[in-house]
Amino acid sequence: MFTKLTPVIFLVCVCSWPVHAQGRDGQHDFDFEIGTWKTHLKRLVKPLTGSTTWVEYEGTTRVTKVMDGRANLVELKVSGTAGTLEGLSLRLYNPESRQWSLSFANIKSGMLTPAAIGEFKSGRGEFYNQDTLNGRSILVRFVISDITPTSCRFEQSFSDDGGKTWELNWIAVDTRVKE
Protein backbone atom coordinates (compact mmCIF):
# COMPACT_ATOMS: atom_id res chain seq x y z
CA MET A 1 0.00 0.00 0.00
CA PHE A 2 2.73 2.52 0.89
CA THR A 3 4.79 1.70 -2.17
CA LYS A 4 2.13 3.18 -4.44
CA LEU A 5 2.07 6.43 -2.42
CA THR A 6 5.82 6.88 -2.25
CA PRO A 7 6.21 8.46 -5.72
CA VAL A 8 3.43 10.95 -4.93
CA ILE A 9 5.04 11.92 -1.63
CA PHE A 10 8.43 12.27 -3.33
CA LEU A 11 6.89 14.52 -6.01
CA VAL A 12 5.34 16.75 -3.35
CA CYS A 13 8.70 17.04 -1.59
CA VAL A 14 10.54 17.92 -4.80
CA CYS A 15 8.00 20.58 -5.70
CA SER A 16 8.30 22.27 -2.32
CA TRP A 17 12.08 22.72 -2.49
CA PRO A 18 13.27 26.28 -3.09
CA VAL A 19 13.90 27.16 -6.71
CA HIS A 20 17.10 29.02 -7.60
CA ALA A 21 17.77 30.84 -10.84
CA GLN A 22 19.26 28.50 -13.42
CA GLY A 23 19.83 31.12 -16.12
CA ARG A 24 23.06 32.59 -17.33
CA ASP A 25 25.16 34.98 -15.26
CA GLY A 26 24.10 38.47 -16.33
CA GLN A 27 26.66 40.42 -14.30
CA HIS A 28 28.24 41.82 -17.47
CA ASP A 29 25.00 42.73 -19.27
CA PHE A 30 25.67 46.47 -18.96
CA ASP A 31 29.36 46.32 -19.94
CA PHE A 32 28.42 47.47 -23.45
CA GLU A 33 27.33 50.81 -21.99
CA ILE A 34 30.41 51.72 -19.94
CA GLY A 35 31.75 55.06 -21.19
CA THR A 36 30.42 58.35 -22.53
CA TRP A 37 27.48 58.70 -24.92
CA LYS A 38 25.80 61.47 -26.89
CA THR A 39 22.12 61.31 -25.93
CA HIS A 40 19.07 62.38 -27.94
CA LEU A 41 16.03 62.28 -25.64
CA LYS A 42 12.31 62.68 -26.30
CA ARG A 43 9.94 62.98 -23.32
CA LEU A 44 6.14 62.98 -23.30
CA VAL A 45 5.23 66.09 -21.31
CA LYS A 46 2.10 64.76 -19.55
CA PRO A 47 2.04 60.95 -19.48
CA LEU A 48 -1.27 59.10 -19.13
CA THR A 49 -3.37 62.19 -19.83
CA GLY A 50 -4.03 61.68 -23.53
CA SER A 51 -1.46 64.36 -24.36
CA THR A 52 0.67 63.93 -27.47
CA THR A 53 3.09 66.79 -26.73
CA TRP A 54 6.73 65.71 -26.71
CA VAL A 55 9.84 67.74 -25.89
CA GLU A 56 13.35 66.95 -27.11
CA TYR A 57 16.75 67.25 -25.48
CA GLU A 58 20.40 66.72 -26.44
CA GLY A 59 23.31 66.05 -24.12
CA THR A 60 25.48 63.34 -22.63
CA THR A 61 25.22 60.17 -20.62
CA ARG A 62 28.20 58.80 -18.71
CA VAL A 63 28.14 55.23 -17.37
CA THR A 64 30.73 54.16 -14.79
CA LYS A 65 31.32 50.59 -13.62
CA VAL A 66 31.62 50.26 -9.82
CA MET A 67 31.88 47.44 -7.27
CA ASP A 68 33.94 45.23 -9.61
CA GLY A 69 31.17 45.24 -12.22
CA ARG A 70 28.33 44.28 -9.89
CA ALA A 71 26.95 47.82 -10.16
CA ASN A 72 27.13 50.91 -12.31
CA LEU A 73 26.21 54.57 -12.10
CA VAL A 74 24.51 56.45 -14.92
CA GLU A 75 24.77 60.24 -15.10
CA LEU A 76 22.52 62.02 -17.60
CA LYS A 77 22.64 65.71 -18.50
CA VAL A 78 20.55 66.94 -21.41
CA SER A 79 19.15 70.32 -22.46
CA GLY A 80 16.39 71.47 -24.79
CA THR A 81 13.72 74.10 -25.25
CA ALA A 82 11.95 72.83 -22.10
CA GLY A 83 15.10 73.30 -19.98
CA THR A 84 17.76 71.01 -18.59
CA LEU A 85 17.31 67.51 -17.19
CA GLU A 86 19.87 65.88 -14.94
CA GLY A 87 19.49 62.29 -13.88
CA LEU A 88 21.32 59.72 -11.82
CA SER A 89 20.65 56.00 -11.88
CA LEU A 90 22.09 53.22 -9.74
CA ARG A 91 22.05 49.70 -11.18
CA LEU A 92 22.81 46.72 -8.95
CA TYR A 93 23.27 43.09 -9.97
CA ASN A 94 21.79 40.34 -7.77
CA PRO A 95 23.83 37.16 -8.39
CA GLU A 96 21.24 34.98 -6.64
CA SER A 97 18.29 35.99 -8.84
CA ARG A 98 20.59 36.85 -11.78
CA GLN A 99 18.64 40.06 -12.27
CA TRP A 100 19.40 43.76 -12.18
CA SER A 101 17.67 46.44 -10.14
CA LEU A 102 17.53 49.95 -11.61
CA SER A 103 16.84 52.87 -9.27
CA PHE A 104 16.63 56.49 -10.33
CA ALA A 105 17.34 59.51 -8.15
CA ASN A 106 14.28 61.68 -7.61
CA ILE A 107 15.61 65.23 -7.36
CA LYS A 108 12.36 66.55 -5.83
CA SER A 109 12.28 64.09 -2.92
CA GLY A 110 15.99 63.35 -2.59
CA MET A 111 15.14 59.63 -2.66
CA LEU A 112 15.69 56.75 -5.05
CA THR A 113 12.64 55.57 -6.99
CA PRO A 114 11.33 52.06 -6.39
CA ALA A 115 13.69 49.70 -8.20
CA ALA A 116 12.78 48.34 -11.62
CA ILE A 117 13.75 44.66 -11.67
CA GLY A 118 14.61 42.63 -14.74
CA GLU A 119 17.16 41.08 -17.02
CA PHE A 120 18.49 40.83 -20.55
CA LYS A 121 17.25 38.13 -22.92
CA SER A 122 18.26 37.86 -26.57
CA GLY A 123 19.97 41.26 -26.53
CA ARG A 124 17.01 43.12 -24.98
CA GLY A 125 16.68 44.29 -21.39
CA GLU A 126 13.24 44.55 -19.76
CA PHE A 127 12.73 45.95 -16.27
CA TYR A 128 9.46 46.49 -14.36
CA ASN A 129 8.29 48.21 -11.21
CA GLN A 130 5.30 49.83 -9.54
CA ASP A 131 5.17 53.55 -8.84
CA THR A 132 2.69 56.37 -8.46
CA LEU A 133 1.92 59.20 -10.87
CA ASN A 134 -0.27 62.09 -9.74
CA GLY A 135 -1.57 59.97 -6.86
CA ARG A 136 -2.43 56.92 -8.98
CA SER A 137 -0.74 53.56 -8.90
CA ILE A 138 0.99 52.68 -12.18
CA LEU A 139 3.27 50.04 -13.64
CA VAL A 140 6.54 51.12 -15.22
CA ARG A 141 8.37 49.26 -17.98
CA PHE A 142 11.92 50.19 -18.96
CA VAL A 143 13.31 48.61 -22.14
CA ILE A 144 16.88 48.66 -23.49
CA SER A 145 17.13 47.56 -27.12
CA ASP A 146 18.88 48.00 -30.46
CA ILE A 147 22.24 47.46 -28.74
CA THR A 148 25.32 47.76 -30.94
CA PRO A 149 28.93 48.66 -30.07
CA THR A 150 28.18 52.29 -30.99
CA SER A 151 24.51 52.85 -30.12
CA CYS A 152 21.55 51.76 -28.01
CA ARG A 153 17.94 52.75 -27.31
CA PHE A 154 16.08 53.23 -24.02
CA GLU A 155 12.30 53.41 -23.67
CA GLN A 156 10.09 53.96 -20.66
CA SER A 157 6.35 53.24 -20.72
CA PHE A 158 3.60 53.58 -18.12
CA SER A 159 0.46 51.49 -17.64
CA ASP A 160 -2.50 52.45 -15.47
CA ASP A 161 -4.55 49.36 -16.34
CA GLY A 162 -2.40 46.62 -14.82
CA GLY A 163 -0.19 46.17 -17.88
CA LYS A 164 -2.94 45.59 -20.47
CA THR A 165 -1.81 48.68 -22.38
CA TRP A 166 1.38 50.74 -22.24
CA GLU A 167 1.98 54.38 -23.11
CA LEU A 168 5.50 55.22 -24.27
CA ASN A 169 6.73 58.40 -22.55
CA TRP A 170 10.54 58.44 -22.76
CA ILE A 171 12.83 57.58 -25.68
CA ALA A 172 16.58 58.00 -25.48
CA VAL A 173 18.94 57.07 -28.28
CA ASP A 174 22.61 57.00 -27.30
CA THR A 175 25.59 57.14 -29.65
CA ARG A 176 29.02 56.31 -28.28
CA VAL A 177 31.53 59.15 -27.95
CA LYS A 178 35.07 58.12 -28.91
CA GLU A 179 37.33 58.73 -25.93
Where are these regions (language model features)?
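Positively charged n-region of N-terminal signal peptides that target proteins for export
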Residues: 1-5
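Bacterial N-terminal signal peptides
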Residues: 6-16
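Hydrophobic small-molecule pocket/channel-lining residues, especially in calycin-type beta-barrels
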Residues: 20-179
